From Swiss-Prot:
Pathway: Purine metabolism; AMP biosynthesis via de novo pathway; AMP from IMP: step 2/2; Purine metabolism; IMP biosynthesis via de novo pathway; 5-amino-1-(5-phospho-D-ribosyl)imidazole-4-carboxamide from 5-amino-1-(5-phospho-D-ribosyl)imidazole-4-carboxylate: step 2/2
Protein's UniProt name: Adenylosuccinate lyase
Lyase found in the keyword field: yes
GO molecular function: (S)-2-(5-amino-1-(5-phospho-D-ribosyl)imidazole-4-carboxamido) succinate lyase (fumarate-forming) activity; N6-(1,2-dicarboxyethyl)AMP AMP-lyase (fumarate-forming) activity
Enzyme class: lyase
Species per Swiss-Prot/TrEMBL record: Pseudomonas aeruginosa (strain ATCC 15692 / DSM 22644 / CIP 104116 / JCM 14847 / LMG 12228 / 1C / PRS 101 / PAO1)
Length: 456
């Protein structure tokens, strides 16, 4: 059976293939091979640029052009050739080396130094840098733009609905009023904190040999400052952060940090998805219908909040994967074991489920329509929420047991506007204070919620 969106085992490459296509050049097998080739090529160029390695003279413009084309314009046919070589070698990184030697043979200048391809490297030197480059491209070109798009979409909604008063609910019960925009602004602030942390995670790399001590490097060129050269390569050539202390593997702590930060963003988005789902259920939001869509196979009237439900489900899967990778990858027996290898092949899966979720949330946000009448009805039915300001003013003027008196009047039961007005009139407080309290309505008792929403 041929692989297609219908036959793929994972919905990431099946049902949701169209939503995850931007990740294929980055996190696929092709993507990993592409980055391995880039690292190998740049390492060879780094050796040629080093005055302490005379056996690899500085490359000509022609040689650098050939190498640059391999690194920056890597073709699918090259990856297919590497997989063909791997069927013989049964070693994926060695197959990359052999492909590069084949390409180097096209130019005598490069053919003469082909044994310096993969010089002094262990496979993990190439792999760890490739993984860091994959994560950087996936984060910067796909993940962060979508994260920012979500925060901006919610921000626009928050500002638009800044002045819409709404009944709060704590423990599911009526509480002091807020505005719908302010509750959305809370989400924006939380999301943007995590976006900043995701963007700020340093992506680490190493190229220090089989156990992290430059053993092979120093045996061949003891006079070269290999640590300085490695730092220049990783930070100057690749734009990553140099990790000076490793075993055979870069310990992956930064991957745990990155995935934990993405998972926190996802957790906040789950909270948002559930809250909006609840507001739709209460009737505070209506959803724009799409011609031809069906909400239920048996109930024709249904317009379900499926986008927020899809988002919540995919975010849960993503976070489960991130949690496993973040807890497993920093652990490796002694100088290394191979348990990280198969796990690292799943770097893009949690990110894929995340972007599926982000697209679903954005689609859901785009369908939302305010039902102002329904929100106002709920608020006007809960005059008991004004017990808080009344008892607070009573405290100011020294009325005994203000909390207890309001508790007796309101706890567990609704009260009318008239009943509250009568209670206020009988209070032993200044007349002007009574006037101000009588002006209060649930819709007007929102503090500075609107101002907070507008400045987000």
């Amino acid at each position: 059976m041929q692989l297609s969106s219908l036959t793929a085992v994972s919905p990431v490459d099946g049902r949701y293939a169209g939503k995850t296509s931007s990740l294929r050049p980055i996190f696929s097998e092709y993507g990993l091979i592409r980055f391995r080739v880039m690292v190998e090529v740049r390492w060879l160029q780094r050796l040629a640029a080093h005055a302490g390695i005379p056996e690899v003279a500085p490359f000509s413009a022609e040689a650098n052009a050939l190498l640059d084309s391999l690194a920056s314009d890597f073709q699918l046919e090259h990856a297919e050739r590497i997989k063909e070589i791997e069927r013989t070698t049964n070693h994926d990184v060695k197959a990359v080396e052999y492909l590069l030697k084949e390409q180097a043979a096209k130019l005598p200048e490069l053919a003469a130094v082909s044994e310096f391809i993969h010089f002094a490297c262990t496979s993990e030197d190439i792999n760890n840098l490739s993984h860091a480059l994959m994560l950087r491209e996936g984060r910067d070109s796909v993940l962060l733009p979508l994260m920012r798009q979500i925060a901006e979409a919610i921000r626009e909604l928050a500002v638009k609905l800044a002045d819409v008063p709404m009944l709060s609910r704590t423990h599911g019960q009526p509480a002091s009023p807020t505005t719908l925009g302010k509750e959305l602004a809370n989400v924006v602030y939380r999301l943007e904190r995590q976006i900043k942390q995701v963007a700020g995670i340093e992506l680490l790399g190493k190229i220090n040999g089989a156990v992290g001590n430059y053993n092979a490097h120093l045996s061949a060129y003891p006079e070269v400052d290999w640590e300085a050269n490695a730092r220049q390569f990783i930070e100057g050539d690749l734009g990553l952060t140099f990790n000076p202390y490793t075993t055979q593997i870069e310990p992956h702590d930064y991957i745990a940090e990155l995935f934990d930060a993405i998972a926190r963003f996802n957790t906040i988005l789950i909270d948002f998805d559930r809250d909006v789902w609840g507001y739709i259920s209460l009737g505070y939001f209506k959803q724009k219908t799409v011609a031809g869509e069906i909400g239920s196979s048996t109930m024709p009237h249904k317009v379900n909040p499926i986008d927020f439900e899809n988002s919540e489900g995919n975010l849960g899967i993503a976070n489960a994967l991130f949690q496993h990778l973040a807890s497993k990858l920093p652990i490796s027996r002694w100088q290394r074991d191979l348990t990280d290898s198969t796990v690292l092949r799943n770097l893009g899966v949690g990110i894929a489920h995340s972007i599926i979720a982000y697209e679903a949330s954005l689609k859901g946000i785009g369908k939302l329509e305010l039902n102002a009448q329904r929100i106002a009805e709920d608020l006007d039915a809960c005059w008991e929420v004004l017990a808080e300001p009344v008892q607070t003013v009573m405290r100011r003027y020294g009325v005994e047991n203000p909390y207890e008196k309001l508790k007796e009047l309101t706890r567990g039961k609704g009260i009318s506007a008239e009943a509250l007005q009568t209670f206020i009139e009988e209070l032993a407080i200044p007349a002007e204070a009574k006037v101000e309290l009588k002006k209060l309505t649930p819709a007007g008792y929102v503090g500075n919620a609107a101002a907070q929403a507008k400045r987000i």
